[in-house]
Amino acid sequence: PLAVAKEYPEVHILTGEGILFWNRGMINAWEAAAKYKDYDAYLWLNDDTNLNKGALETLVKTADEAGWKKIIVGSCSKIDNPSIITYGGRNAKKHLLRPSLNKAIECSFFNGNIVLIPQFVYKVLGTNDPVFHHSLGDFDYGLRGVKKNIQSLIAPGILGECDRHEALPSWCNPQ
């Protein structure tokens, strides 16, 4: 946080006690951002995910083409093998989908590593559901979108790198 604050003094850094985990941490950050300003969109970006060059531009272009009314999902590949998709949009059978190289494709739900949530979507769905401590809040958000007729689109190309976490550690959803 100190390096970020030094390099980007305009960034608002939230501190915590390490008990929120991914989903509740996302809720905390999202609520703080929404109180600060009515942004055009909110970006979910996992701290273990590295963005590829042009990723943000691709997300924004895809949102623009979708009229800023759909959830935009970025796909991630394995760090040492860009041909292996590790996170991104999924179909109804829970399988990861390979992004198109040149157009957005629809998905049923998604991993929350790289996701752009337009203001329109936020106004309809709100933030993540706090019932989830760590994992599954991202899947739930996409499925809630389906129930409200909000599509999720996978942006073209591979937008980031993040190695796969093969099994959920026991701390993912503490009791």
Across the structure, where does each feature detected by a protein language model lie?
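Acidic donor-binding segment of Leloir-type glycosyltransferases
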Residues: 1-15
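A recurrent flexible, glycine/aromatic-enriched loop bordering the glycosyltransferase active site
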Residues: 96-117
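Glycine-rich, basic loop-to-helix element that forms the pyrophosphate-binding segment
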Residues: 16-35
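Conserved donor-nucleotide/metal-binding helix-loop-beta segment in metal-dependent transferases, i.e.
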Residues: 56-71
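Short beta-strand-to-loop element that shapes/binds the nucleotide-sugar donor at the catalytic cleft/hinge
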Residues: 72-85
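Acidic donor-binding loop at a coil-to-helix junction in glycosyltransferase catalytic cores
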Residues: 133-140
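Active-site-adjacent helix/loop segment of glycosyltransferases
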Residues: 143, 147-175
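Short beta-strand-to-loop acidic/aromatic patch adjacent to the donor-nucleotide binding site
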Residues: 38-50
